[in-house]
Amino acid sequence: MQERSDFPIAIIGAGFAGIGAAIQLKKAGIQSFTIFERSSEIGGTWRDNTYPGAACDVPSHVYSLSFEQNPNWSRRYATSSEIQEYLLGVVDKHELRERMRLDTEIVEARFDEESGSWFLTTNEGEAFTGRVVIAGVGGLVDPSYPNIAGLDQFEGEMMHTARWDHDVDLTNKRVAVIGTGASAVQVVPSIAPIVAMLSVFQRTPAWVVGKFDALYPNWLRRFLARVPFFLRASRFVKYWTSELRGPIVFFNSRILSRIGVALSIWNLRRQVKDPELRQRLTPDFQFGCKRVLVSDDYWASFERENVDLVIDSIEGIESKGIRTKDGSLHEADAIVLATGFKLGLATAPFPIIGRQGRTLDEAWAGGAVAYKGMTVAGFPNWFIMMGPNTGPGHTSVLVYTEAQISHALQAIKTLMAENLKYMDIRQDVQDQYNASIQKRMKHMVWGGCKSWYLNEDGSNHSLYPGFAAEYVLRTRKLRSEDYETAAF
């Protein structure tokens, strides 16, 4: 495709989505893009989450870009630092740094119908123009801090898992961990061997299945590097293994749920011998309606003499520790907040003003919706990566991300080839699509309990109700007739 200097493209965010989009644009011969990243380095999730034990919970060969496969993963489930190293290498290989604006936060985006352009404003007051915006800002970015009385009264060290302070030495310290979600199941077994005492405060137990992590031997990595076919085959097998397990996680089926429960109970029994402790660690909600966690050693940590599971509700935090509602004070030298992230899909990441001055927050007042999770009526030429109802509950998020990048690239090529000002998804098409998504939600397991998946009204605007392969097929071909267009 002939390069168009008059067709600037803005990519917001330098995580997997932004980097992947930039690579595919370059491969298509489109060089007129700029990547805006609010932090001083690329990486997104894997730049920020560096707590002990941080790792992906899907196999490494699937948790990587299909067009940048890596034969050198050291283990089945890559660590945070290894994933970040992979991303840094990909950025350097494709010479993307020259097109990046690091330490540059977009604070407002405003669409101009006359020019068919988005006007972006940075935190420094600079102005940029983009004919197309690819928004890869991520849905789980900013840490969520618990609403607990006295949070600022604690005299010891306190840190969120997503903002880990590596200057704090937890060796032989009394440590409290609040939360038992995805980060807790990784950090707890990682710090348990070094601390004097570890108190884990559990509000709700989680279903945890075996991870079966393992190191890859050097000979295997050399073999995969020399014979790329087997690297692709390994990815293929791991992907379809995750897909075929998907129904256990997301379909509202009593039989499938029992299979999931059996797998989790087996994992619990092999790690914990104390029946009373097993009872306290066993959830009472349907398998899959909250995020299913993976770990080989989280539950085993509670068998250690220096690890205590606290199930009493927290009353508040005091200068010396955590007070529970039974009156007990659990003294601590450090508190780790494993309390997850603010759900970025609930609101726009910054003011986004579309056609006729309507903001994205106004469009999403009744819940975040988008056509195929990517485009929102009234916000032309704006493509969301991992938008509403595109989260996976069973496989790699990158399968969805790559499908979205491909879809956005088709739209960009159409805009350029047909000399269009903009493409704006029709409201009726968007409404019809999202009605079908919510109808399918009735057959999914996620409505069976309260979780961050659900809005206050109980609707689910986070996850995709089906297989990743199906989503890829639904997004493979751009339907121009679904869009309102305007020519110059």
Task: Outline where the language-model segments fall.
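Short beta-strand to alpha-helix junction loop
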Residues: 70-89, 252-259, 285-297
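A conserved short coil-to-beta-strand element within the FAD-binding core of flavoproteins
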Residues: 102-116, 308-323
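C-terminal active-site-capping segments
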Residues: 399-402, 406-488
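Helical element adjacent to the flavin cofactor pocket in flavoenzyme catalytic cores
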Residues: 82-100, 291-315
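Rossmann-like dinucleotide-binding core of oxidoreductases
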Residues: 3-6, 10-11, 16, 20-41, ...
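Beta1-alpha1 glycine-rich phosphate/pyrophosphate-binding loop at the start
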Residues: 4-100, 202-203, 270-276
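Glycine/threonine-rich phosphate-binding loop and adjacent beta-strand/alpha-helix elements that clamp
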Residues: 334, 338-415
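Feature captures the FAD/FMN-dependent oxidoreductase FAD-binding
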Residues: 75-140
